[in-house]
Amino acid sequence: MTRIDDTFRRLRAEGKKAFVAYIMAGDPDLETSLAVMRGLPEAGVDIIELGMPFTDPMADGPTIQTAGQRALEGGQTLTRTLEMVRAFRAENAETPIVMMGYYNPIYARGVETFLAEATEAGIDGLIVVDLPPEEDAELCLPAQAAGLNFIRLATPTTDSRRLPKVLQNTSGFVYYVSITGITGAAAAQAADVAPEVARIKAATDLPVIVGFGITTPEAAQDLAGIADGCVVGSAIVKLVGEGRPVAEVLDRVAALAAGAHAA
């Protein structure tokens, strides 16, 4: 059992939905992003997704691409991202952390080395957007052997033939991308997403979390209500990018979390 599994079990017992928040590590600098990260649990965040900045983020929309660029320009590296996690874990042993990004930085570091460092730092799961199930032997299976959850994305184009393959070695939760395309695009509508979430839930016992396009507490409530929770990324990253004070960012996160928890 990972911290992710424990969190969903607790939320189920409380009759609550999960609120997942995404931030980019090192955006706009290490100090600010760590301050935001430290404040997320108190703001109501159940699971933290920590973006690993990468030079070619093909699945990300402009908001998150720009955040990654700012982080890289500020000197953020995979080593510093792991240091961030260690600093957070020195104060918080409960909140699950999922690292999200691309395979290249992990491959460059060496899978075995990365997994040893990630587990030691206190990472609970990985989302690697450019590794399909056909390449599970590369990272997914070694990650699970190391005790990490490997979380997979399903999309509106994941048809019934493809879905079992996507779910095959997935653990922790399934991340349903409610809009086809890049992150932070048009808003998702609960009525459109509900049948797709039901289709995925019929094929797995794992929790299903809906993401992409959620910007308001009302949308968080609507979308969390048809799934096991929701994730907000671009709306939070946008505030950081605008240079808003950490307290203001966290107030906004708290409002979004309250929306999800009201579902």
Curated annotation (Swiss-Prot):
Record-level GO cellular component terms: cytosol
Pathway listed: Amino-acid biosynthesis; L-tryptophan biosynthesis; L-tryptophan from chorismate: step 5/5
EC number: 4.2.1.20
UniProt cross-references to InterPro entries, sorted A to Z: Aldolase_TIM, RibuloseP-bd_barrel, Trp_synthase_alpha_AS, Trp_synthase_suA
CDD domains, alphabetized: Tryptophan_synthase_alpha
Family: Belongs to the TrpA family.
Function: The alpha subunit is responsible for the aldol cleavage of indoleglycerol phosphate to indole and glyceraldehyde 3-phosphate.
The protein's name in its UniProt record: Tryptophan synthase alpha chain
Origin species: Cereibacter sphaeroides (strain ATCC 17023 / DSM 158 / JCM 6121 / CCUG 31486 / LMG 2827 / NBRC 12203 / NCIMB 8253 / ATH 2.4.1.) (Rhodobacter sphaeroides)
